[in-house]
């Protein structure tokens, strides 16, 4: 039997996840805890969660590093953290006026102790996560991706990620979203 008390869905909005504690800044159907994630500390004990999901929420927060430190604080060692965030040069990063930032595929490497980014700038944060995987979400035929018959495509293949990543860094709106899975160290 799964324990709902050790899985956290941050910024749930109307995307309520069964078996998770659903947190949002506004009361809505299925929201278990109302809390503004910009207010620290979050209302959870240290080392409480084995899994955290943050789909399209981190980009709304005022302080990204502080949010990562809170995720680190509330997760158990080896916890799984799954995030979806807008890609740095996607229009999705800045169309929504409540978005504070976009993200690059190496952004989360600053928290990975095996990464040269983390090794060079270990003073940025004490939070440590291993980057388990990442993928790109692209939508063919932009700007037609809002049409109901045009589906997003998630790129997980290593070689395709290299190619799409190169193109996505040269041209805007090729990569819409970054999905990353982290493991708390």
Residue locations for each model-derived region?
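S-adenosyl-L-methionine-dependent methyltransferase catalytic module, highlighting the catalytic core
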Residues: 65-66, 76, 80-185
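Polar low-complexity intrinsically disordered regions
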Residues: 1-4, 131
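Conserved SAM-binding loop
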Residues: 3-89
